[in-house]
């Protein structure tokens, strides 16, 4: 006899709809045998369930019945969902889990994986070779066909009261949920199905979507005699006191567990489960899902089907498998100890005073998803209170600032970090580190808006330091489990007798004396359910309202929202940074990396490490060195360190000690006044936290030129008259690809920023036509006042770099960036400009490209020369510090030297 073949591989390929004998879905499975044969079989989910029960019966040890830790038999994805086999979504959802189950099954030891049950299951059957043909749609099935049970329309009910399950055979409900009714029972317990589970629920928690009540009255001649099997003390005026053994007449029945009875000439309501018909057994509380309504009971406690499968025939197994939890095995003793009183527990009464269907609740709001924050790129800080980190680290966000800087904590370190380097992920049970990919530009814009909205809603205890709100704690759901432990008449105090008390820990079960031990617990009244829920919801609303109303103010911005029209030339520019002015300034931070932090050049050149928001991505600009862009022409934001003034700075030289990088945001014209104002607002928050620029405009000059540098939203027009020149570099600046942080200034700037640090906003594209003048608002507050002096406006603070015989990388690309968005968002700019055109700007060899005109008079000092408005210069070198090496061509005696670039505009 040849050896029996074994299974080599099993692959679940897809699902397929079948209509014979009724509508259902089967799984298409490809089985490869050791003989080399490959066969296709079709199995519905219930067959897998049958196989699983056989496996658990045959291999109790491997099934984990005695020790769950020793279980090696895989779990099925879930129980059988009664009357759900015809729903495609249910079948598709289990496609992958079924495939994993089959693969795990055949990898078990041979005595399991090659046992008769497994081999027979995967053997080809006649119906696999000849699938049943579909019958005509109009043809009705014979009423005697026991398999024609699936094609039925299930009633749908809406949950009108929360319910927390008390037994494993029950399921919990939440207000607004829609359930399918599989079985209705006179006991008041209905077997229902949701998208995920099935079980028993009290009918009084449900209401038909059409408001129809399941109730029927009996004619006087049809009134039935029932015997009271448990004493009952009325808790409401319309209820009846019952004594054990009393015979009552049932006047009105319903399917909600409360019947109207007549006793001693009075009529009232009593729990149906406390009564039994004189001629038979007590009314069974719950019916099996396959039993007809109002028929005999079938105990469905939701225990493992394995417990009920022992010693039963397959037909019984098929009838009762629904509602079982396959993976949860309950010891036999636990089943035997289940008291009938729990299964006879009456449901809460429905409030008859509330019209049905009056206010069907809306579906509940889904719970908030807890989120975690991780760094998505490496960051090296250059500010005293910043924090450096690597990519992929979990951080705790302590404070979010609309300026684009967040105060975070990582283990024992904390400091300011750019929000664009941090992303949030949904918290999951698996602690696997997320795959960190930099968000796309359009995603960053959405993230910025989402973060701004989240910041407004954040609540938390009083924080240490300047406005340090903590994220809002997730809203906890109302504890519906305690709703049933109250007196069910709302605010009325009922007699708390031992026979009518409710225990919060056991749901409906009563605390009664030993003689009444088998008595079912008293049902809560329906009206009390509603009142109690309203009280709890109102209490919850009152608790949440102050929290919602006390959302923290956004961290302050340094700049005013709308700049003054004419800022004085001698405006103080070295005031210490105020702590609270930022709060006046609701800003939109969509500048990406341009917020004052240092990013290494190697990161800038890696697109996936640039979490930057820009309205139109320009890949060509990614190659431009971030440290080498000129301050006037730069149209792409700089991913550069947030510079601090050089220690060589002499406060006595000028009160306009400005940051050479922050200055760049002040010099570019904008296309329109409206956008310029918007840009000014949004970039005030992004300015440098330790340096800034303050200046005014010449009369007659218009605002709105700053947007011409795409993304630098703080920029000013070249027509704008700067109050003072930008600081020059203390030494020749290497415009190469390396970022050299500027030396830190005095100790006054070393202190921790009281507001989130800021970096220069992105530059904007230059506009050829000057509009009305828009003054640059003062950037620095009181911090600049401490060390200010009053020298001549426009006097340089730092020694300019020496002229170089070649065009460095810093000068190269400045004109290119004129029409490009750079690394930051492009507010305005010519979208149609191509990289070829930009490349022509890079090599500023022709005289036309290197000719600039002075837009204002400049008073020099011992290191610089003065010039008048209208002087024509040929730019020899553009330095990233904001100072250009130029030669005078007209309007003044010929000379060469360093001049501030914000006094120049390109000659038309």
Swiss-Prot record:
Disruption phenotype: Exhibit skeletal, cardiac and eye phenotypes. Mice have glaucoma and suffer growth retardation as well as craniofacial defects. Skeletons show marked kyphosis, poorly aligned teeth, anomalies in the iliac crest, and a prominent xiphisternum. Mice show loss of adipose tissue as well as cardiac deficiencies, such as dysmorphic ventricular chambers, thin mitral valves and immature and disarrayed trabeculae with frequent apical indentation. Mice show loss of ROS formation. Keywords: Cell junction, Cell projection, Cytoplasm, Differentiation, Phosphoprotein, Repeat, SH3 domain. InterPro entries: NADPH_Oxidase/PX-Domain, PX_dom, PX_dom_sf, SH3-like_dom_sf, SH3_domain, SH3PXD2_PX, SH3PXD2B_SH3_1, SH3PXD2B_SH3_2. Disulfide bonds: none annotated. It is found in: Cytoplasm; Cell projection, Podosome. Phosphorylated in SRC-transformed cells. Adapter protein involved in invadopodia and podosome formation and extracellular matrix degradation. Binds matrix metalloproteinases (ADAMs), NADPH oxidases (NOXs) and phosphoinositides. Acts as an organizer protein that allows NOX1- or NOX3-dependent reactive oxygen species (ROS) generation and ROS localization. Plays a role in mitotic clonal expansion during the immediate early stage of adipocyte differentiation. This is SH3 and PX domain-containing protein 2B. It comes from Mus musculus (Mouse). The gene is Sh3pxd2b.
């Amino acid at each position: 006899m040849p050896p029996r073949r074994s299974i080599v591989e099993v692959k679940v390929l897809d699902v397929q709809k079948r209509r014979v004998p009724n509508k259902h879905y089967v799984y298409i499975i490809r089985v490869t045998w050791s003989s080399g044969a490959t066969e296709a079989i079709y199995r519905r989910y219930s067959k897998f369930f049958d196989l699983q029960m056989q496996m658990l019966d045959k291999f109790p040890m491997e099934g984990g019945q005695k020790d769950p830790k020793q279980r090696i038999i895989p779990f099925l994805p879930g129980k059988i969902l009664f009357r759900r086999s015809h729903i495609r979504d249910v079948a598709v959802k289990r496609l992958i889990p079924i495939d994993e189950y089959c693969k795990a099954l055949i990898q078990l030891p041979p005595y399991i994986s090659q046992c008769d049950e497994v081999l027979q299951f995967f053997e080809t059957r006649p119906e696999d070779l000849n699938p049943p043909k579909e019958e005509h749609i109009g043809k009705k099935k014979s009423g005697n066909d026991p398999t024609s049970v699936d094609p039925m329309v299930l009633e749908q009910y809406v949950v009108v009261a929360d319910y927390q399950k008390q037994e494993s055979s029950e399921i919990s409900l939440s207000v607004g949920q829609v359930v399918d009714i599989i079985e209705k029972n006179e006991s008041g317990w209905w077997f229902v199905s949701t998208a995920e589970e099935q079980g028993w629920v009290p009918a009084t928690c449900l209401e038909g979507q059409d408001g129809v009540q399941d109730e029927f009255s009996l004619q006087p001649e049809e009134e039935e005699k029932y015997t009271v099997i448990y004493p009952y003390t009325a808790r409401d005026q319309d209820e009846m006191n019952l004594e054990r053994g009393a015979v009552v007449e049932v006047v009105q029945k319903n399917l909600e567990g409360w019947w109207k009875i007549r006793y001693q000439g009075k009529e009232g309501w009593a729990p149906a489960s406390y009564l039994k018909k004189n001629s038979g057994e007590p009314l069974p509380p719950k019916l099996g899902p396959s039993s007809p309504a109002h028929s005999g009971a079938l105990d469905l406690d939701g225990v493992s089907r394995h417990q009920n499968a022992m010693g039963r025939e397959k037909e019984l197994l098929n009838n009762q498998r629904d509602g079982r939890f396959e993976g949860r095995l309950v010891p036999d003793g636990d089943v035997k100890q289940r008291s009938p009183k729990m299964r006879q527990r009456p449901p809460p009464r429905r409030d008859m005073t509330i019209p049905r269907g009056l206010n069907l609740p809306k579906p509940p709001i889904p719970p908030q998803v807890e989120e975690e924050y991780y760094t998505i790129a490496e960051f090296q800080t250059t500010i005293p209170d910043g924090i450096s980190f690597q990519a992929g680290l979990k951080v705790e966000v302590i404070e979010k600032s609309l300026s684009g800087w967040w105060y975070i904590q990582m283990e024992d370190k904390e400091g300011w970090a750019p929000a664009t380097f941090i992303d949030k992920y949904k918290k999951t049970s698996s602690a696997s580190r997320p795959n960190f990919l930099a968000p796309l530009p359009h995603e960053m814009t959405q993230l910025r808006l989402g973060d701004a909205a989240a910041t407004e809603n954040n609540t938390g205890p009083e924080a240490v330091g300047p406005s340090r709100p903590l994220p809002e704690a997730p809203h906890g759901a109302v504890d519906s489990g305690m709703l049933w432990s109250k007196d069910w008449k709302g605010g009325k105090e009922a007699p708390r007798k031992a026979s009518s008390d409710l225990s919060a820990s056991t749901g409906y079960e009563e605390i009664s004396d030993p003689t009444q031990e088998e008595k079912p617990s008293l049902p809560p009244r329906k009206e009390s359910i509603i009142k109690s829920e309203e009280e709890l919801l109102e209490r919850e609303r009152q608790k949440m309202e102050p929290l919602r109303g006390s959302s923290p103010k956004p961290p302050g911005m340094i700049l005013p929202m709308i700049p003054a029209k004419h800022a004085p030339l001698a405006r103080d520019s070295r005031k210490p940074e105020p702590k609270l002015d930022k709060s006046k300034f609701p800003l939109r931070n969509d500048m990406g990396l341009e917020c004052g932090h240092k990013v290494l050049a190697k990161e800038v050149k890696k697109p996936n490490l640039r979490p930057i928001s820009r309205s139109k991505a320009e890949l060509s600009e990614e190659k431009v060195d971030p440290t080498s862009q000129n301050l006037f022409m730069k149209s792409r934001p700089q991913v550069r360190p947030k510079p601090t003034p050089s220690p060589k700075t002499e406060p006595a030289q000028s009160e306009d000690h400005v940051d050479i990088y922050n200055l760049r945001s002040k010099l570019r014209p904008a296309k329109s006044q409206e956008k310029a104002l918007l840009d000014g607002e949004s970039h005030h928050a992004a300015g440098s936290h330790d340096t800034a620029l303050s200046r005014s405009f010449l009369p007659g000059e218009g605002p709105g030129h700053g947007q011409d540098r795409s993304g630098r939203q703080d920029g000013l027009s070249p027509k704008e008259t700067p109050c003072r020149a930008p600081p020059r570099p203390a030494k020749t600046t290497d415009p190469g690809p390396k970022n050299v942080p500027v030396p830190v200034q005095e100790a006054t700037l070393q202190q921790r920023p009281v507001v989130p640090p800021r970096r220069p906003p992105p530059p904007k594209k230059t506009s050829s036509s000057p509009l009305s003048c828009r003054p640059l608002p003062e950037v620095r507050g009181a911090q600049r006042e401490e060390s200010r002096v009053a020298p001549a406006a426009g006097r340089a603070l730092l020694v300019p770099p020496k002229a170089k015989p070649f065009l460095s990388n810093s000068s190269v690309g400045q004109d290119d960036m004129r029409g490009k968005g750079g690394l930051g968002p492009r507010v305005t700019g010519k979208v149609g400009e191509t990289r070829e055109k930009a490349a022509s700007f890079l090599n500023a060899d022709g005289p036309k490209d290197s000719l600039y005109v002075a837009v204002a008079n400049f008073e020099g000092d011992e290191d610089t020369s003065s010039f008048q408005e209208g002087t024509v210069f040929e730019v020899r070198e553009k330095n990233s510090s904001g100072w250009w090496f130029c030669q005078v061509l007209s309007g003044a005696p010929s000379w060469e030297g360093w001049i501030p670039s914000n006094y120049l505009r390109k000659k038309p």
